[in-house]
Amino acid sequence: AVVIVATVRALKMNGGVAKDNLAEENLDALKAGSANLLRHLDNVAKYGVPAVVAINRFPTDTEAELELLRDLCKEKGIDVVLSEVFAKGGEGGMELAKEVINICENQKSDFHTLYDVNDSIEDKMNTIATEIYGADGVDFTADALKQVRELEKLGLDRLPICVAKTQYSFTDDPKKLGAPKNFRITVREVKVSAGAGFIVALTGSIMTMPGLPKVPAANGMDILSDGTIIGLS
Protein backbone atom coordinates (compact mmCIF):
# COMPACT_ATOMS: atom_id res chain seq x y z
CA ALA A 1 0.00 0.00 0.00
CA VAL A 2 1.05 3.58 -0.63
CA VAL A 3 0.61 6.24 2.06
CA ILE A 4 0.30 9.73 0.58
CA VAL A 5 0.93 12.35 3.25
CA ALA A 6 -0.72 15.74 2.83
CA THR A 7 -1.46 18.79 4.94
CA VAL A 8 -4.37 21.19 4.74
CA ARG A 9 -1.89 24.07 4.90
CA ALA A 10 0.15 22.89 1.91
CA LEU A 11 -2.95 22.30 -0.19
CA LYS A 12 -4.27 25.78 0.62
CA MET A 13 -0.92 27.21 -0.45
CA ASN A 14 -1.27 25.30 -3.71
CA GLY A 15 -4.65 26.98 -3.99
CA GLY A 16 -3.10 30.43 -3.83
CA VAL A 17 -3.17 31.31 -0.12
CA ALA A 18 -0.23 33.34 1.19
CA LYS A 19 1.91 31.72 3.86
CA ASP A 20 0.82 34.24 6.50
CA ASN A 21 -2.86 33.34 5.96
CA LEU A 22 -2.64 29.55 6.03
CA ALA A 23 -4.13 29.32 9.53
CA GLU A 24 -7.42 30.79 8.29
CA GLU A 25 -10.18 28.51 7.00
CA ASN A 26 -10.44 28.78 3.22
CA LEU A 27 -12.48 26.03 1.60
CA ASP A 28 -12.29 27.50 -1.90
CA ALA A 29 -8.49 27.61 -1.86
CA LEU A 30 -8.34 24.14 -0.32
CA LYS A 31 -10.52 22.72 -3.07
CA ALA A 32 -8.46 24.42 -5.76
CA GLY A 33 -5.17 23.29 -4.24
CA SER A 34 -6.43 19.74 -3.81
CA ALA A 35 -5.97 19.30 -7.55
CA ASN A 36 -2.33 18.72 -6.63
CA LEU A 37 -3.21 15.89 -4.25
CA LEU A 38 -5.67 14.35 -6.71
CA ARG A 39 -3.00 14.22 -9.40
CA HIS A 40 -0.72 12.37 -6.98
CA LEU A 41 -3.56 9.91 -6.38
CA ASP A 42 -3.97 9.42 -10.13
CA ASN A 43 -0.23 8.79 -10.41
CA VAL A 44 -0.23 6.11 -7.73
CA ALA A 45 -3.18 4.41 -9.42
CA LYS A 46 -1.12 4.13 -12.62
CA TYR A 47 1.29 1.86 -10.76
CA GLY A 48 -1.53 -0.48 -9.75
CA VAL A 49 -1.01 -0.06 -6.00
CA PRO A 50 -3.82 0.76 -3.49
CA ALA A 51 -3.38 3.94 -1.47
CA VAL A 52 -4.55 5.86 1.57
CA VAL A 53 -4.22 9.58 2.24
CA ALA A 54 -2.76 10.51 5.62
CA ILE A 55 -3.53 14.07 6.67
CA ASN A 56 -0.75 15.37 8.89
CA ARG A 57 -3.06 17.37 11.13
CA PHE A 58 -2.29 20.88 12.36
CA PRO A 59 -4.17 22.59 15.22
CA THR A 60 -5.48 25.20 12.77
CA ASP A 61 -7.19 22.62 10.53
CA THR A 62 -10.96 22.99 10.76
CA GLU A 63 -13.49 20.17 10.64
CA ALA A 64 -14.97 21.66 7.47
CA GLU A 65 -11.58 21.55 5.76
CA LEU A 66 -10.93 17.97 6.82
CA GLU A 67 -14.40 16.92 5.67
CA LEU A 68 -13.83 18.54 2.28
CA LEU A 69 -10.66 16.51 1.80
CA ARG A 70 -12.46 13.33 2.81
CA ASP A 71 -15.17 14.01 0.24
CA LEU A 72 -12.72 14.79 -2.58
CA CYS A 73 -10.70 11.65 -1.95
CA LYS A 74 -13.81 9.52 -1.48
CA GLU A 75 -14.87 10.45 -5.01
CA LYS A 76 -11.73 8.61 -6.16
CA GLY A 77 -12.36 5.69 -3.86
CA ILE A 78 -9.53 6.65 -1.50
CA ASP A 79 -9.89 6.81 2.28
CA VAL A 80 -8.50 9.67 4.34
CA VAL A 81 -6.99 9.06 7.77
CA LEU A 82 -5.76 11.67 10.24
CA SER A 83 -2.18 11.36 11.45
CA GLU A 84 -1.49 13.09 14.77
CA VAL A 85 1.86 11.49 15.57
CA PHE A 86 3.59 14.80 16.22
CA ALA A 87 1.06 15.79 18.89
CA LYS A 88 0.21 12.39 20.35
CA GLY A 89 3.21 10.20 19.62
CA GLY A 90 2.62 6.61 18.53
CA GLU A 91 -1.01 6.74 19.62
CA GLY A 92 -1.64 9.42 17.00
CA GLY A 93 -0.65 7.02 14.23
CA MET A 94 -2.71 4.01 15.25
CA GLU A 95 -5.63 4.76 12.94
CA LEU A 96 -3.28 5.09 9.98
CA ALA A 97 -1.44 1.89 10.85
CA LYS A 98 -4.73 -0.03 11.08
CA GLU A 99 -5.86 1.32 7.72
CA VAL A 100 -2.59 0.31 6.04
CA ILE A 101 -2.95 -3.21 7.46
CA ASN A 102 -6.55 -3.31 6.26
CA ILE A 103 -5.56 -2.29 2.74
CA CYS A 104 -2.72 -4.81 2.58
CA GLU A 105 -4.99 -7.62 3.72
CA ASN A 106 -8.08 -6.79 1.68
CA GLN A 107 -7.02 -4.99 -1.49
CA LYS A 108 -5.03 -6.45 -4.35
CA SER A 109 -1.83 -4.87 -5.60
CA ASP A 110 -0.79 -5.15 -9.23
CA PHE A 111 2.41 -3.14 -9.17
CA HIS A 112 4.00 -2.37 -12.51
CA THR A 113 6.35 0.29 -13.80
CA LEU A 114 5.43 2.81 -16.47
CA TYR A 115 8.43 2.23 -18.71
CA ASP A 116 10.89 -0.47 -19.66
CA VAL A 117 14.43 0.27 -18.47
CA ASN A 118 15.59 -0.77 -21.94
CA ASP A 119 13.73 2.15 -23.51
CA SER A 120 15.87 5.08 -24.63
CA ILE A 121 16.66 7.83 -22.13
CA GLU A 122 14.50 10.25 -24.12
CA ASP A 123 11.52 7.87 -24.13
CA LYS A 124 11.82 7.11 -20.41
CA MET A 125 12.03 10.78 -19.54
CA ASN A 126 9.08 11.57 -21.78
CA THR A 127 6.99 8.90 -20.04
CA ILE A 128 7.80 10.36 -16.62
CA ALA A 129 7.03 13.91 -17.76
CA THR A 130 3.73 13.14 -19.47
CA GLU A 131 2.36 10.39 -17.22
CA ILE A 132 3.51 11.67 -13.81
CA TYR A 133 3.99 15.43 -14.12
CA GLY A 134 1.22 16.05 -16.65
CA ALA A 135 3.58 17.79 -19.07
CA ASP A 136 3.11 17.96 -22.83
CA GLY A 137 6.61 16.61 -23.36
CA VAL A 138 10.33 17.02 -22.69
CA ASP A 139 13.01 19.25 -24.16
CA PHE A 140 16.69 18.38 -23.81
CA THR A 141 19.31 21.11 -24.01
CA ALA A 142 22.16 20.60 -26.47
CA ASP A 143 24.52 19.74 -23.60
CA ALA A 144 22.04 17.25 -22.15
CA LEU A 145 21.62 15.50 -25.51
CA LYS A 146 25.39 15.24 -25.84
CA GLN A 147 25.54 13.62 -22.40
CA VAL A 148 22.78 11.19 -23.40
CA ARG A 149 24.77 10.09 -26.44
CA GLU A 150 27.86 9.61 -24.26
CA LEU A 151 25.91 7.37 -21.86
CA GLU A 152 24.65 5.36 -24.80
CA LYS A 153 28.20 4.80 -26.03
CA LEU A 154 29.20 3.61 -22.55
CA GLY A 155 26.23 1.27 -22.35
CA LEU A 156 24.85 3.10 -19.31
CA ASP A 157 21.58 4.24 -20.85
CA ARG A 158 19.54 1.16 -19.87
CA LEU A 159 19.00 2.24 -16.28
CA PRO A 160 16.04 3.75 -14.40
CA ILE A 161 15.84 7.55 -14.31
CA CYS A 162 15.82 9.69 -11.17
CA VAL A 163 14.61 13.20 -11.97
CA ALA A 164 16.17 16.03 -9.96
CA LYS A 165 13.36 18.60 -9.91
CA THR A 166 11.76 21.14 -7.60
CA GLN A 167 9.55 19.52 -4.98
CA TYR A 168 7.14 22.44 -5.03
CA SER A 169 5.61 21.89 -8.45
CA PHE A 170 4.80 19.24 -11.05
CA THR A 171 6.69 21.53 -13.45
CA ASP A 172 10.35 22.51 -13.27
CA ASP A 173 9.28 25.97 -12.04
CA PRO A 174 8.72 26.07 -8.24
CA LYS A 175 6.26 28.96 -8.60
CA LYS A 176 3.73 26.99 -10.66
CA LEU A 177 1.61 25.36 -7.97
CA GLY A 178 -1.49 23.19 -8.06
CA ALA A 179 -1.83 20.83 -11.02
CA PRO A 180 -0.55 22.84 -14.00
CA LYS A 181 -1.26 21.96 -17.62
CA ASN A 182 0.18 23.02 -20.97
CA PHE A 183 3.86 23.01 -20.04
CA ARG A 184 7.04 21.17 -20.97
CA ILE A 185 9.92 19.89 -18.85
CA THR A 186 13.45 20.94 -19.79
CA VAL A 187 16.35 18.61 -19.01
CA ARG A 188 19.56 20.63 -18.72
CA GLU A 189 21.96 17.90 -17.60
CA VAL A 190 22.12 14.11 -17.62
CA LYS A 191 24.56 12.07 -15.57
CA VAL A 192 24.81 8.58 -14.17
CA SER A 193 25.06 7.44 -10.56
CA ALA A 194 26.59 4.09 -11.47
CA GLY A 195 26.97 2.81 -7.92
CA ALA A 196 23.33 3.55 -7.12
CA GLY A 197 22.25 2.16 -10.47
CA PHE A 198 20.29 5.02 -11.99
CA ILE A 199 20.52 7.97 -14.37
CA VAL A 200 19.98 11.47 -12.99
CA ALA A 201 18.13 14.00 -15.15
CA LEU A 202 18.50 17.52 -13.79
CA THR A 203 15.81 20.11 -14.49
CA GLY A 204 15.35 23.77 -13.65
CA SER A 205 17.77 25.30 -11.16
CA ILE A 206 17.62 22.40 -8.72
CA MET A 207 20.73 21.43 -6.74
CA THR A 208 21.34 17.78 -5.95
CA MET A 209 23.47 18.63 -2.90
CA PRO A 210 23.29 19.76 -0.21
CA GLY A 211 19.72 18.84 0.69
CA LEU A 212 19.51 21.32 3.56
CA PRO A 213 17.32 24.33 4.42
CA LYS A 214 18.86 27.79 4.68
CA VAL A 215 19.32 27.22 8.42
CA PRO A 216 19.97 23.50 9.13
CA ALA A 217 18.25 22.03 12.19
CA ALA A 218 21.68 21.08 13.52
CA ASN A 219 22.27 24.76 14.27
CA GLY A 220 19.69 24.55 17.06
CA MET A 221 20.95 21.31 18.59
CA ASP A 222 23.25 21.07 21.58
CA ILE A 223 24.34 18.80 24.41
CA LEU A 224 24.09 20.19 27.94
CA SER A 225 26.69 19.57 30.63
CA ASP A 226 24.57 16.77 32.11
CA GLY A 227 24.41 14.99 28.75
CA THR A 228 20.88 16.07 27.87
CA ILE A 229 20.40 16.62 24.15
CA ILE A 230 18.28 19.64 23.24
CA GLY A 231 16.92 21.08 20.01
CA LEU A 232 15.75 17.84 18.40
CA SER A 233 12.20 19.12 17.94
Locate the predicted segments by residue.
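A solvent-exposed, charged loop/short amphipathic helix patch at secondary-structure junctions
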Residues: R9-L30
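Structural beta-sheet core signal
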Residues: I4, V53-I55
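Hard-cation-handling environments
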Residues: H40, A45-G48, I55, T60-T62, ...
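C-terminal effector/interaction modules appended to NTPase cores
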Residues: A29, Y168-S233
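Structured loops at beta-to-helix junctions and adjacent beta-edge loops in soluble globular domains
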Residues: T7, A164-T166, T203
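Aromatic/hydrophobic pocket-lining residues that form the small-molecule binding cavity
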Residues: L30-G33, L37
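Cap/lid and interdomain-hinge subdomains that line or gate substrate/regulatory clefts
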Residues: N36, P50-A51
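Inter-motif core of Ras-like GTPase G domains
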Residues: A1-A10
